[in-house]
Amino acid sequence: MNMPSWLIFLLTGWTFCGNFFACGGLDYDYPNYENEEEKNEAIDYKDPCKAVVFWGDIALDEEDLKMFHIDRTIDLTQHSNEKLGHTTGGLEEHDLSKKRGALYQLIERIRRFGSGQENTTANSQKVDNNQSGKSKKIRIPRAATSRTERIWPGGVIPYVIGGNFTGSQRAMFKQAMRHWEKHTCVTFIERTDEESYIVFTYRPCGCCSYVGRRGNGPQAISIGKNCDKFGIVVHELGHVIGFWHEHTRPDRDDHVTIIRENIQPGQEYNFLKMEPGEVHSLGESYDFDSIMHYARNTFSRGMFLDTILPSRDENGLRPPIGQRTRLSKGDIAQARKLYRCPACGETLQESTGNFSSPGFPNGYPSYTHCIWRISVTPGEKIVLNFTTMDLYKSSLCWYDYIEVRDGYWKKSPLLGRFCGDKLPDVLTSTDSRMWIEFRSSSNWVGKGFAAVYEAICGGEIHKDAGQIQSPNYPDDYRPLKECVWKITVAENYNVGLTFQAFEIERHDNCAYDYLEVRDGSSENSPLIGHFCGYDKPEDIRSTSNTLWMKFVSDGTVNKAGFAANFLKEEDECARPDNGGCEQRCVNTLGSYKCSCDPGYELAPDKKSCEAACGGLLTKLNGTITTPAWPKEYPPNKNCVWQVVAPSQYRISMKFDYFELEGNEVCKYDYVEVRSGLSSDSKLHGKFCGTEVPEVITSQFNNMRIEFKSDNTVSKKGFRAHFFSDKDECSKDNGGCQHECINTIGSYVCQCRNGFVLHDNKHDCKEAECEHRIHSSNGVITSPNWPDKYPSRKECTWEISATPGHRVKLSFSEFEIEQHQECAYDHLEVFDGETEKSSILGRLCGSKVPEPLVATGNEMFIRFVSDASVQRKGFQATHSTECGGRLKAEAKPRDLFSHAQFGDNNYPVQADCEWILMTERGLRIELNFQTFEVEEEADCGYDFMELFDGHDASAMRLGRFCGSGPPEEIVSTGDAVLIHFHTDDTISKKGFHIRYRSVKYQDILHTK
């Protein structure tokens, strides 16, 4: 039987009524992040995390169990209940008794179903034979009929991205969707008013998605912790489109071997497979390369133990499985069959391109059907120009024709239907998508047609809502672009603009690349903002129904750009009833909210106000405490203190005691400190837990402190005192040439990198540029950063890190004069303490280099500029990586467990390997100066292992934890492998080893 490449969701059987979803499925470890989404997430979607039981990463109810073939060699009664939900954590939403009850129901039903397979088949034949006898075909109750309601109509999938994702995550989601669009005829569109759509959310079950379209409302695709990787999102979208995992297909045993003894206890059920009658074969062979296939070591007892072993190919090689980088050829072929994509046509995503009828210019075949989808960046328009047109001409273009539609699919507005030999006029879309369909049904032979298109950015937009993105978003914008948009919404409304992502080349004055926004319809309208850098601009609201935007990029550094939504906006607070608010009404884009005067808080109706803690404080210093201090604070409190000092003063807040209910994102009880008096002022921090915050100093002469508690756990609270200090730097920069640093009672001037302070303590002059760095991490920059580096400058950095740890250099920004051989301005990095060490790289240009890693704990860096062109320079972070190869010599050397040994405990989830080597004939002696590692009877949590050779296959000298080895250890050969592993909980001081090479005779003499 020729089975499909993927287990497609074309489920069958009228008895089926369960809710299925599938997840990423590769061994991710998810803690419980229940309810970690933003509180303003108001979409009532179908949540894939709420399942009775899980089949690995697929949710099942009792009826769903009929879908799967059960291999009776698996004894599901041996499963460990505690292991359920390993990859997704979905069962953590139920208490343990519910887990166990559901599991045993699953086990019992699977066992009954597995043992009754033969009878089921016999009974089905008997039922068929009792029918009229006109049909000779054997009918199985769960026949292989397609569930068409699970296919997205027209291949169009509307989506919404939740508000709790960063700009880079949103860009990556869009890249993943464009990847599917590029290779198939599936189309993802931002949801407007569609009833059924997907919602990208952050859910506690990690990487999760339903399989296919659920219908009757939104459905979630969960991108949880550690899931925000391109390949994982492409995989999850595969489930949305309608695919199961490859390794569960019925004929998988012909292609892979399941090695059960290597499977983690309690996880054997993840390797069950589906019934042949439950999937629809589309003629595709087993696809080892599928992005929907599990890896070889999924749910393995050990990293290097296989659980799924692919069969050897004709060359005797085992194909790789479990890739998460891109769609395979089989993935693409199967998706195109599932959605019945025409064999002719494609999705065009470049800014310019061309296409033509099949066989052009030698004639097109009859009965041809082609579809081209042009998709460019939102905010761009498509200009389509036919350069040749030679089709059979008929009345109303009935037979052979080409149709162009202004949108993403066949129901979009028609721009024109063409045939004959007359060239159509140039066609321009109103948005960023265009749909072109070609059909032929005559036997007439003509050349066909050819067309070219171009994406143009900017233009006039007359819509009440939409999206604008920089050219080529979510990829880097193109150089030398200038785009101007004029947005017009309905009369008597304003234009609201909110940014989802923002990353434009940074410059103090936004001189290179920038986005300019003006309050009106022209470049002469009042300026709202001139934006660049990586911080998202605040929401923008025009004063009329028009907004003018201009994006400019120069010819050098290109970034990801921006994505923004616009909408028609009204001020609900301007209504006569003040929006129904008792005291204050705060207008927001697309909505509004009520707030209260200081000393009051919102009542449960969210409209009226009642007395609260907090208030307006105008003293130069004072104390703030939580309600009921020093007793536990009450539940459901909202306190706002507004502290105001005289002009040119700054306010500092110091917490003396701090104890609030805590979690990682401070979503229950917390205190927020802001510069300014409003709730949307600059946030200095959101604090909870028991760690006392650092001293906070306001940017201006006012500060807002807000405390909130929920209705559950209460703690002692906090006590803080504030004091005000005059900021001499706020006026004329304190007279400093470069930077002014305010201090309590005074101020100091500070110079940028490459300069020193003049004797007058205000001016800066060029300095010697030699740096010696002995810290494990930090930041280095070119002189005068972030302004252009000076000419004729040479700077050096000698970085020395903790012994046993390699120096790593990572660049965040880079712009040095370009030359093919970096002969002019350049940056050199050497693998050692001087420029005589081997070179790791000689760098110039505007492309950010890949990270550079030294082989040891020293790195030498030299920057040189000539007398001509100056650029922005570079900014880089130096850090350390543990492990590496170290040479043991007669003189003792040191090795430390972690780079911050002595200052901090070792980090969690560390995994480091050092190979100590010496000359042939010598041995290596290890003396433990310090050893303090989490203790456990079998050293199963944190430990250090020693192997008497170059790798872990050598004889193990011991596994140590607690206080370590009782005495020094000597190898029997010229190499020792040290392996240090920590788990994700308790950490200790670590270890300090002093090692050297010794002669065997010396050891005997010493002993």
From Swiss-Prot:
Q: Which residue intervals make up region (Disordered)? A: 115-139
PANTHER family per the UniProt record, alphabetical: METALLOENDOPEPTIDASE (PTHR24251:SF45), OVOCHYMASE-RELATED (PTHR24251)
Residues annotated as glycosylated: 164, 354, 385, 621
According to its UniProt record, which residues of this chain constitute the active site? 236
Q: Which domain of life is it from?
A: Eukaryota
Q: What does the record note about the cofactor?
A: Binds 1 zinc ion per subunit.
Q: What is this protein called?
A: Tolloid-like protein 1
| Pfam families listed in its UniProt record | Astacin, CUB, FXa_inhibition
Name the lineage.
Eukaryota, Metazoa, Chordata, Craniata, Vertebrata
Q: Which UniProt keywords apply?
A: Calcium, Developmental protein, Differentiation, Disulfide bond, EGF-like domain, Glycoprotein, Hydrolase, Metal-binding, Metalloprotease, Protease, Repeat, Secreted, Signal, Zinc, Zymogen
